[in-house]
């Protein structure tokens, strides 16, 4: 693991939400439907009570709950405490970073010859939702509503890039911008099954790299499953650590 990049990552995590006793950093979606713990520095003995408190708080809000664990988080038994609290571990992803100040020549060349994806308007989020549905995603309407709220209230923090083929939306991804930290993040990449393995995902990545540079970002981050990580490493992204979401099942509320 790269210590400078880990330090930068933790700084971004601490900025991404609201501090709460623990200490933890709590991130709440604009519509209040999702609560996520994105950073923690709790003592071993305090962990169980803090986890119970945060899960109960989320359920009291009627929100989904997630604790986002990273490979370098402490204490080492944090993952065990999350499981013992009844949270469910989802797929582990690799955290990768790209230095936008020193792009690989292959990426610069590809950006020159690749037509950029379309930066979506709020109205075009309907096309993003269409891609999501055709990709088998759930909660599409709620996601579209959250994205529309963010794009309306804080347009400098979020972009959605869409690739169209013959007028139909086939691939897309989000770009999250945190201008004070000069960091940006790729998220929400998805492609309609019939159009996969045709370079459309790469097009959305290149388009978002260009947009991140234009916005003044210096480092671009992404959490990637193995298939996406393979494409991203070929574009110069470097593995930094791993991350894994732990989500609360509604049964916890009654315990």
What do these predicted ranges mean?
Residues 1-61, 74-77, 154:
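N-terminal charged segments
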Residues 18-21, 77-88, 157-172:
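Conserved beta-hairpin
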Residues 27-38, 90, 177-187, 196:
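A conserved beta-turn-beta hairpin within the catalytic core of GNAT-like acetyltransferases
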Residues 47-123, 222, 228, 244-248:
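Acyl-donor-binding surface of acyltransferase catalytic domains
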